């Protein structure tokens, strides 16, 4: 008999035996078995069977427990294992006979339950009292399994397999749980055409991630529910299969295939009433194939797909389709491709307008139409690694979520007032311990202040709570209105015109009036509100900024003034290069004002000039100005790319080469930080092929890396530096001393044009020639270097005073036109820094002292009072 039991039947008998042993019962009875059936880990088939005959499972369990409580128990170390009593043997015999009559090869848990109802004694009486007679249970069992026989050891997991491993989209559409689908009529019509074919009626939706492939299927489900489809598709069910759920928990070899086979049989038995949908269709290739087996889900689907017995809609991305589906031509030819293209910005705005109500109801906030337009436009402009409409929807969702979080958090006014109250309370506790007259007077004043602040805090809190309630009421009314409209639509569809008319002409208009009144009251109160209640374009821009680091928002007054004074700000740090500062400042202002060419980098410059005049320093100053951190730039030393084989490191190694997965040093840095200053230092030392790579960046603001991903450079400022022709500017070259500045620059540009290809130079925004530094500029640079040293000394509470004579000495001694300002930096380090370090370590200069630096004869005096000549 044991060999004929299904897996779950065997588990139930083992559990019943264990229960009898733990209770000390000498006999194994139908009551033990019934409790084991009810308490099994996978007992949903028993639960469904009892529910089908309207039996109360809790009452059955309680009644069976009472039966067990009356059984005699035996204790002791020599107690024999419990043996099946006469009633249990009769139950098993009855169950075996019924299985034979039904043509089943195995004895399932349902057979045992029916056997208990027929011959289970006291346990059978418990079932009968709840209306679960053997006859009723048998009828329900036959109806549930739908004519299928028990031919495997795990038949219980195969009943209602489609319900278990699928999601009914048409049921979700009928309940109004799906979002509206806008602007995909052509794709839905194409899917309907393919589904209406006689054979190979299997469309596969192909498109980039986030363009709305699943939404097309949801739109089809909504059309089926509305009846807006051809006769061949009317009243059909659209069920999404979950292959992951089928694979999950499949412990034994062949269990996944058994589950899939059962689902396919159920679909086939529906006689064309079920259309299946598999999202991520590429997962069927290889799913379930274990060990050396070639029988995966794809191969199991092929025969039914070819004969037209299975109408399936698939969805997958272009890359996955190419990599997985196209490699199996037999599977590919059974599907008809339907391309889902990325919608335009205008179409995305229409989609967002259709979804606006759902997001307003969910977040209980208002969303301005201008915010939807901003979401579509800004996501298209700045979030280039993803696709519309998904990225625009995410922007709106996150902006609304952020606003909702702000509404639920304390406003700044209340937060600040609460901190003041807490501080006053702590002060009150401290002063309360003092007994002198002045302290008592101070305490009285403090208590009056505290009472006033607490009163003000209570008033503000009450006002904030009232505003929140008003806001929440509007959100709740919108949610209720959405629900009633869904009910009215369902009532019309089901032909319940009485309910539909009550909703359409009674409840819905009344609710709309309430909503209008609440919205008007809220608008009136919004003129002097503490909480913002509408998502606007600035909120969308803030989210874009937090995702990408790009300041896409409207210019604030403070930032406007800062940009207008950009030359002055950069000029504080970069001395004597006004032309270069002007060119860079103009590029940044063009972008922030929104008038720059959106298809090119923010700016691309070639900085030329002798060493040490500020080419690299300007890039650092610009990064500091834009990001408040001079390290926030992508710096690549082009001398590392002098050999041909190193060029690939910029964009990443091609497939098949070591390092392919790592990506390129330039492309990865910009992909992670799309709004940045990119500094390509000493570009003349790079291999000529580097410039071929840079052509696309300079012209179109894009570069394709080694893995085929397009990296967006449109929000970067590209700065290339070079020392070419510097001999004409430094005074150490062939140029005559009386040569004018213009003539020197012309000579430099001639050298540059001879060294770089015309197509490269022609794509740059500007060639900026840096001048050699004069004596006055070196004095200002010396002052900058001294200020930086003073900042470092301030951390040790040391104050630095440098006389004008000392600055003049530094400028004179550090002046070397061939090397720019770098000798001056070294001079400050040796003449002041090194001497000061010795004096600090020797204890001559202590924390809190003022250090004076002055010129004396041929050197400097450094120290708190007087020092030695250097």
From Swiss-Prot:
Superkingdom of the source species: Bacteria
PROSITE patterns xrefs: CLP_R, CLPAB_1, CLPAB_2
Region feature Linker, mapped onto this chain: 343-549
GO cellular component: cytoplasm
Entry coiled-coil feature ranges: 393-527
Chief place where the protein resides: cytoplasm
Protein's recorded name: Chaperone protein ClpB 1
Organism: Streptomyces avermitilis (strain ATCC 31267 / DSM 46492 / JCM 5070 / NBRC 14893 / NCIMB 12804 / NRRL 8165 / MA-4680)
């Amino acid at each position: 008999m044991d060999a004929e039991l299904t897996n779950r039947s065997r588990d139930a008998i083992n559990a019943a035996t264990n229960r009898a042993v733990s209770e000390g019962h000498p006999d194994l009875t139908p009551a033990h078995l019934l409790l084991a059936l009810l308490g099994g880990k996978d007992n949903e088939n028993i639960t469904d069977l009892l529910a089908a005959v309207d039996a109360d499972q809790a009452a059955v369990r309680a009644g069976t427990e009472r039966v067990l409580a009356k059984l005699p128990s035996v204790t002791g170390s020599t107690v024999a294992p419990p043996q099946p009593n006469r009633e249990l043997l009769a139950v098993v015999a009855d169950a075996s006979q019924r299985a034979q009559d039904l043509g089943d090869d195995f004895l399932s848990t349902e057979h045992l339950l029916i056997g208990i109802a027929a011959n289970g004694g006291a346990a059978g009486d418990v079932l009968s009292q709840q209306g679960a007679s053997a006859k009723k249970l048998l009828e329900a069992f036959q109806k549930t399994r739908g004519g299928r026989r028990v031919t495997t050891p795990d038949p219980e997991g195969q009943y209602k397999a489609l319900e278990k491993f699928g999601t009914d989209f048409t049921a979700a559409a009928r309940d109004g749980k799906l979002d509206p689908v806008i602007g995909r009529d052509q794709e839905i019509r194409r899917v309907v055409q393919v589904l209406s074919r006689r054979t190979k009626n299997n469309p596969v939706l192909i498109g980039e991630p986030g363009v709305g492939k699943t939404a097309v299927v949801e739109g089809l489900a909504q059309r089926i529910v509305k009846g807006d489809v051809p006769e061949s598709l009317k009243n059909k069910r659209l069920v999404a299969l979950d292959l992951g759920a089928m694979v999950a928990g499949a412990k034994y070899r062949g269990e996944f295939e058994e589950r899939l086979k059962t689902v396919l049989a159920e679909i086939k038995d529906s006689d064309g009433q079920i259309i299946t949908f598999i999202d991520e269709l590429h997962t069927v290739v290889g799913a379930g194939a274990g060990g050396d087996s070639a029988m995966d889900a794809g191969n199991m689907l092929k025969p039914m797909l070819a004969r037209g017995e299975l109408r399936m809609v698939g969805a997958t991305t272009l890359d996955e389709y190419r990599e997985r589906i196209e490699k199996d031509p037999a599977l590919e030819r059974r599907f008809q491709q339907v391309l889902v293209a990325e919608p335009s910005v205008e179409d995305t705005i229409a989609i967002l307008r259709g979804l606006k109500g759902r997001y307003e109801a969910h977040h209980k906030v208002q969303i301005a139409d201008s915010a939807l337009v901003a979401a579509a436009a800004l996501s298209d402009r700045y979030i280039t690694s993803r696709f519309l409409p998904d990225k625009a929807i995410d922007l709106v969702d996150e902006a609304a979520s952020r606003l909702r979080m702000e509404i639920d958090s304390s406003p700044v006014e209340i937060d600040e007032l609460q901190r003041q109250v807490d501080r006053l309370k702590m002060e009150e506790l401290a002063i309360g311990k003092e007994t002198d007259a002045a302290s008592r007077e101070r305490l009285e004043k403090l208590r009056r202040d505290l009472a006033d602040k607490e009163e003000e805090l209570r008033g503000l809190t009450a006002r904030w709570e009232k505003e929140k309630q008003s806001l929440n009421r509007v959100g709740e009314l919108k949610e209720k209105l959405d629900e009633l409209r869904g009910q009215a639509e369902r009532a019309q569809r089901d032909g319940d015109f009485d309910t539909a008319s009550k909703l359409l002409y009674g409840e819905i208009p009344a609710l709309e009036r309430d909503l209008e009144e609440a919205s008007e009251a809220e608008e009136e109160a919004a003129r002097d509100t503490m909480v913002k209640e509408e998502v606007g374009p600035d909120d969308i821009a803030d989210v874009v900024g937090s995702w990408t680091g790009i300041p896409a928002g409207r210019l604030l007054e403070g930032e406007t003034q800062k940009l207008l004074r950009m030359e002055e700000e950069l000029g504080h740090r970069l001395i004597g290069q006004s032309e270069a500062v002007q060119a860079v400042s103009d590029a940044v202002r063009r972008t922030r004002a929104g008038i720059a060419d959106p298809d090119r980098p923010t700016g691309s410059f070639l900085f030329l000039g002798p060493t040490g005049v500020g080419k690299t320093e300007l890039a650092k100053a610009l990064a500091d100005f834009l990001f408040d951190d001079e390290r926030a730039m992508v710096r690549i030393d082009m001398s590392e790319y002098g050999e041909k084989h190193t060029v690939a490191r910029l964009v990443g190694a091609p497939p098949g080469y070591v390092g392919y997965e790592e990506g390129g040093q330039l492309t990865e840095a910009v992909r992670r930080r799309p709004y940045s200053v990119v500094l390509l230092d000493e570009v003349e030392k790079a291999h000529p092929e580097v410039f071929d790579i840079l052509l696309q960046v300079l012209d179109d603001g894009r570069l394709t890396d080694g893995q085929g991903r397009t990296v967006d450079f449109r929000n970067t400022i590209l700065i290339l530096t070079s020392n070419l022709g510097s001999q004409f500017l430094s005074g150490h070259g062939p140029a005559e001393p009386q040569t004018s500045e213009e003539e020197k620059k012309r000579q430099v540009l001639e050298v540059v044009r001879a060294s770089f290809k015309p197509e490269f130079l022609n794509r740059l925004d500007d060639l900026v020639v840096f001048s050699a530094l004069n004596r006055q500029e070196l004095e200002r640079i010396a002052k900058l270097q001294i200020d930086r040293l003073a900042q470092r000394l301030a951390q040790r509470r040391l104050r630095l005073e440098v006389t004008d004579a000392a600055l003049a000495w530094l400028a004179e001694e550090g002046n070397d036109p061939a090397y720019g300002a770098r000798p001056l930096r070294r001079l400050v380090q040796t003449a002041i820094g090194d001497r000061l370090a010795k004096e600090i370590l020797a204890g001559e200069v202590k924390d809190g002292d003022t250090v004076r630096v002055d010129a004396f004869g041929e050197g400097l005096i450094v120290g708190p009072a007087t020092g030695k000549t250097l």
